[in-house]
Amino acid sequence: MSASINRWGMLAAHVCINFVLGGVYAFSYFKTPLMAQCHWDPATLALAFSINMGIIPLPMIWGGRMIDNGKGKQAIVIGGILFSLGFILSGFVDNLPMLFLTYGVIAGLGSGLAFTGNLNNILKFFPDRRGLASGIVLAGVGVGTLLCTRLAEYFMAQTHDVSRALLYLGIVYLVVIFIVQFFIRSAPAKDSGGIKASPLDKDYRHMLKDLRFWLLFMILALGVFSGMVISSSSAQIGMTQYGLLSGALVVILVSIFNSIGRLFWGGLTDKLGGYNTLVIVYLFTCLCMLLLFFFNGNTSVFYFSALGVGFAYAGILVIFPGLTSQNFGMRNQGLNYGFMYFGFAVGAVIAPYVTSAIAKYTGSYNTVFILTTVLLLIGVVLTLITKKYVATVLAKIH
């Protein structure tokens, strides 16, 4: 990389982009007023969030190609515009199919394109400190959720209209994207000489034939499921099962702890390695889920566990970009991580709908807590198996 590039200043700009993208997780706050204002079924409404999460990997494939070809900034700007437009248009919808299109599809496409551009572009400026760099950038998502939730509260208080609140949020997002993009530069294309070739390098075709990819894919999907249980439904869980009068505070606190977690796990990953850190993350999340199950109605336990899951979930998002490049090289990281992110989509699509559906038909979230614990324990076993297998493969490569 050119010595003239201030990579830390670039890092700050990328964090600001994620302030905007973190707004996607503020959907948990909007669910209750949307149900009240539009009389929509909670499980069906949750599909909007699931569509948004599920569609994200598709533009990440396109964005990955742009990044690897030296067009990271363009990916961020185009994605940011689409993301903002999705919120703006959501302010004009009056039925669920249109919300699925605006918030689900349009905002989801923008989120995926901007997210992969933002993360993988900056990682190419930090080959020596990938865990820390990804942790700092991804912390912006958590902080962004906090900021956007507070903005949503403010707009709701001023307008008493969820549609106008969505519209105003979209406009704010668009203004931020326009300003911050002036401080971002694209990383060099993979064939420009800016990224050194490595024996680890694999393109997506070879990666998809590699058992390591599918093991990591499954581990990611299992972990994301647990995080999405809280990210998508923390407000509803707190109000229906733990006696909270409002879900806004827990959404804000989960966002804060998620941001702290991204910084914490990023630094820890650089010290302990991705696989060891992942085991710690999954076991801690298991503990939180079991506490939720055994201490029903205890508000203190709910806050501890919900914040704990938010804190731990951050580790999953920080660890996997590094694991992808460690196994398949940095040369094609943009496109490769786009495919890996489909594992995120699997967990993200299933979790909100399953959580809402189980709560609707059983009257509580207890079954969700047990299901999540079992999935996480499977993830721990797969992580230990993968760690051993990867060590054998890498020993042969080197």
How would you label these PLM feature ranges?
Residues F27-K31, L211-W265:
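Extracytoplasmic gate region of multi-pass secondary transporters
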Residues L34, L113-F126, S134, G315-F328:
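Intracellular juxtamembrane helix-capping segments at the cytosolic ends
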Residues L34-M35, M66-I67, L147-T159, G238-M239, ...:
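Interfacial helix-cap and linker-helix signal at transmembrane-aqueous boundaries
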Residues L58-L96:
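Conserved MFS/SLC helix-loop-helix module at the cytosolic interface between two early adjacent transmembrane helices
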Residues M98-G112, V301-A314:
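Hydrophobic core of transmembrane alpha-helices in multi-pass small-molecule transporters
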Residues V141-R185:
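Helix-loop-helix hairpin linking two adjacent transmembrane segments in secondary transporters
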Residues S186-K202, V393-H398:
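Flexible cytoplasmic inter-helical loops of multi-pass small-molecule transporters
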Residues I252-N258, L263-F264, T269-L323:
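C-terminal transmembrane helical hairpin of 12-TM major facilitator-type secondary transporters
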